[in-house]
A protein has these predicted regions:
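A metal-dependent hydrolase signature that marks the N-terminal structural subdomain at the beginning
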Residues: 1-117, 240-257
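Short glycine/proline-rich turn/loop motifs
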Residues: 175-183
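Short pre-active-site segment immediately N-terminal to the catalytic Zn-binding motif
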Residues: 107-125, 186-189
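Short alpha-helix boundary/capping elements
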Residues: 74-75, 133, 137, 206
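Generic structural signal of hydrophobic/aromatic residues within well-ordered alpha-helices
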Residues: 46, 50, 150, 166, ...
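Pan-zinc metallopeptidase signature
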Residues: 1-22, 182-257
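Post-HEXXH active-site segment of zinc metalloproteases
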Residues: 118-122, 134-173, 213-222
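Catalytic glutamate of the conserved HExxH
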Residues: 123-136, 200
Length: 257
C-alpha cells in the first residue's frame, strides 16, 4: 500500500463513492467530507447563492468540500484527500483539485487551507465563474462594456490574469499603433474578456453570500479595478443573472472621512 494511503489519506474517487451528494434548490450538487470545520447551514447558504441560470450550466459538476486536497506531488497515487487537518499535510495541500469521476466532474475544495468564510466563498465562486464561462461563454453585452472600459484605460483589473491579458491585448509592451490606434491582439483580447467575466461572476456571487469591503480583494501584483468600473460590471451581471429568492445584491459606498 502506498505511503500516502497508509498515512490516512483517502483516494478522491473513494470519497466520491462513499459520500452522499446533496443538491440545493438552485440545482448545485455538493457534499462535505471529513473535519471541514464548516457549519452545514452556512455551507448550504453559500452554495445556494449561485443564481439558477448559472447553476444550470454546471450540471456535470459536483463540489466536494474536504479538509485538504493534496497537491500534484502525490499524482502517482491519484488525487488524495486528507479527512482531517495537520500542519504537515497542510503544507502539501492545494486550494482545490479537479477530478474526473466518470460522467461527473468533481471539484475538491480544501476548506482548512482557506482561513475564513470569505476566503472559502471566494474560492468556490471563482471555480463556479470559470466553469460557467467554459460552459456558456461571455455575453456580448458584457464584452462591449468591458472592452469600452479597457479602451478608455480605466484603472486596474479584477485579477492578475485579466490585468496581464488586457495589457497584452492593447498593444502589448511595445504600445504599437496604426493610424494612431493601438494594435489589438485578438487572442489576448478574448482571454481578457473571459477572465473579466468570470471574475465579475465570482465577485457578484461573493457579494450575495458575504458582506465584504472591496479592498479585501487587493493583491500586490496588480492594481484593483476602479470601483465605479467594477460597479458597472456587477450591475450588468446582476441584470443578466438576478439573485435567487432570499438573496440581495447591493453596492454600498463608504463616505470619505
Amino acid at each position: 500500500m502506498a505511503e500516502g494511503v497508509q498515512s490516512g489519506l483517502i483516494q478522491a474517487t473513494q470519497v466520491a463513492r462513499d459520500t452522499a451528494v446533496r443538491q440545493t434548490a438552485n440545482g448545485i450538487n455538493y457534499t462535505a467530507f471529513g473535519e471541514t470545520n464548516l457549519d452545514e447551514k452556512d455551507l448550504q447558504r453559500m452554495v445556494q447563492a449561485v443564481p439558477v441560470p448559472i447553476a444550470r450550466a454546471l450540471g456535470r459538476k459536483t463540489y466536494y468540500f474536504v479538509p485538504l486536497a493534496m497537491s500534484e506531488g502525490r499524482v502517482s497515487e491519484g488525487t488524495l484527500i486528507a479527512p482531517t487537518y495537520t500542519p504537515e499535510l497542510g503544507d502539501q495541500a492545494i486550494c482545490h483539485r479537479n477530478v474526473s469521476l466518470g460522467a461527473i466532474d468533481g471539484v475538491f475544495i480544501s476548506t482548512r487551507l482557506l482561513g475564513d468564510r470569505f476566503a472559502l466563498a471566494f474560492e468556490f465562486f471563482i471555480n463556479v465563474g470559470h466553469a460557467f464561462v467554459d460552459a456558456a461563454g461571455v455575453p456580448e453585452i458584457f464584452n462591449e462594456l468591458v472592452w469600452a472600459q479597457a479602451v478608455a484605460d480605466v484603472r486596474g483589473e479584477t485579477s492578475q490574469d485579466a490585468w496581464e491579458s488586457r495589457n497584452l491585448a492593447i498593444g502589448g509592451d511595445s504600445g504599437s499603433k496604426i493610424d494612431g490606434k493601438p494594435v489589438i491582439d485578438e487572442k489576448a483580447k478574448s482571454s481578457f474578456l473571459e477572465s473579466a467575466f468570470s471574475d465579475a461572476v465570482a465577485i457578484y456571487q461573493l457579494s450575495l453570500s458575504v458582506d465584504f469591503d472591496y479592498s479585501e480583494l487587493r493583491e500586490r501584483e496588480y492594481p484593483l479595478l476602479a470601483p465605479q468600473a467594477l460597479a458597472e460590471r456587477l450591475r450588468l451581471v446582476a441584470k443578466l443573472f438576478p439573485p435567487n429568492p432570499g438573496y440581495e445584491f447591493a453596492i454600498r459606498y463608504r463616505r470619505r472621512a
